[in-house]
Curated annotation (Swiss-Prot):
GO terms for biological process: cytoplasmic translation. Belongs to the eukaryotic ribosomal protein eL28 family. InterPro entries: Ribosomal_eL28, Ribosomal_eL28/Mak16. This is Large ribosomal subunit protein eL28. It comes from the Eukaryota. GO terms for molecular function: structural constituent of ribosome. The gene is RpL28. One of its GO terms (cellular component) is cytosolic large ribosomal subunit. Keywords: Ribonucleoprotein, Ribosomal protein. PANTHER family: 60S RIBOSOMAL PROTEIN L28 (PTHR10544).
Length: 144
């Protein structure tokens, strides 16, 4: 017999392997997969919900991958995840992700969090700007 997601959350909320408690922080963090905010809360939990959403960097470090869990195959772990790659460029990829989530009406409450996580992943893949003397050498000028 399947239990509700609320009951599952009440059971695991204070004690699970993904919980990360820090000193002087009221709300504990979470390291569980498909948790967009990395916060231990019912809304973002990737364990208790039938439909979850995760955004991870793509395998080749160009773009990101959206990992969706199908509610239909909740009892079949091998079949219940779908991975969608987004590599078209930052703005286009974010627009495609938004269209995917809004068009399919898949967890409307996670749309904004997914866009923020995808944007952070794309920002982390940008090369850092070179500053100082190294920048002058990169431009072809010699420092004086």
């Amino acid at each position: 017999m399947a239990t509700s997601s609320h009951l599952n959350w009440l059971i695991i909320r204070n004690n699970n392997a993904f919980l990360l408690k820090k000193r002087d922080v009221k709300k504990p963090f979470s390291t569980e997969p498909n948790n967009l905010a990395s916060v231990s809360s019912y809304r973002y939990s990737g364990i208790v919900h039938k439909k979850t959403l995760g955004v991870v960097p793509a395998a080749d470090k160009k773009g990101f991958t959206a990992v969706l869990k199908k509610g239909k195959y909740a009892q079949r772990p091998a079949k219940n995840t779908v991975r969608v790659d987004f590599k078209a460029g930052p703005r286009r990829s974010l627009k495609k992700l938004k269209n995917l989530l809004i068009g399919s009406k898949y967890r409307k409450d996670l749309t904004q969090a997914a866009l923020r996580r995808a944007s952070a992943v794309l920002r982390s893949q940008k090369p850092a700007p070179v500053k100082g003397k190294k920048a002058e050498f990169a431009k072809g000028k010699k420092p004086e």
